[in-house]
Amino acid sequence: MPELPEVEVTRRSFASQIAGAQVLSVTLGKPLRWPLGRAPSSLVGARVQQVRRRGKYLLIDLDRGMLMVHLGMSGSLRFATQLPAALGPHEHFDMQTDRGTLRLHDPRRFGAVIATDGDDDPVARKLLDGLGMEPLDAHHFRWESFRDGLARSRTPIKP
């Protein structure tokens, strides 16, 4: 399963390339863990504003909504200027932009791509609200609070 650092590396690998890109088409392969939530054609014409990460979710902010991507157990994202037109047997989401194509490869299909109206969308809130603080955000995560939290607890970190 991709852990948080791998998800962050994935985000960094394509975030600057896709920011500002316009969505030309969206193609779905076999169903993933959750449905997209809207017609793929509704994303055509949208512009990618930025790519963020919250926990293990990649959040692709569009000028009209947001895509939430979870890589599941075996998923990976690839952004390239030239990919085969047809989806392979383990490729389940393809977003072609004017700068390249973002493709989800997930052999076990535990991943998900969900289209929402943004951070305040009920689906987004349900998935993101319980995630806790961001360990890679120095503004919110401080050594002192971590140490104090450990000192107050008698629960083993990993039994």
What are these regions (language model features)?
Residues 67-159:
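Phosphate/anion-contacting hairpin/loop surfaces
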